Amino acid sequence: ARCSMLNSPEYNLDQSDTYKAIDEFQLFMNHYPESGLVDSCNTLISSLRSKLETKSFEKAKLYYKMEKYRSAVILFNTTLEEFPDTDFKEEVLYLIIRSNFLFASNSIQTKKEERFDNTIKSYYTFVDQFDSSKFLKSAESYFKSSKKELDKLRNVN
């Protein structure tokens, strides 16, 4: 397990050895639950999971930077599902709002209403958890713009 951990590369590279190390540490703890090394194994697993968490977040941000907003939202949500207590949660939720808004803005007319609704829903999810965030002003701006766009769309229809 320790060898696999030492082979585990930086977060931006293939993480096969990271997964292998986590599995091996877990296997050790399952076979030797009374071992004095269990606490050490848990600490090392936590460190390895942190690397996977960073990789997941950075991959989603890459899609965001490439303006693949729909894919970015999917990957940001995957990050939250796989790492619910992530240190990046505030930024992830904010980037979901931003990605949803930009995706809606660049959508065809018939899809805009649904997609601006998604922006508003993601805003509410964000403020429920981070009502005093450093991203709050910007998030509110996307929320207000989405409301305006929805009003325009609903008045046309």
Please identify what each model-predicted range represents.
Residues 1-157:
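Acidic, polar-rich low-complexity tracts and alpha-helical solenoid repeat scaffolds
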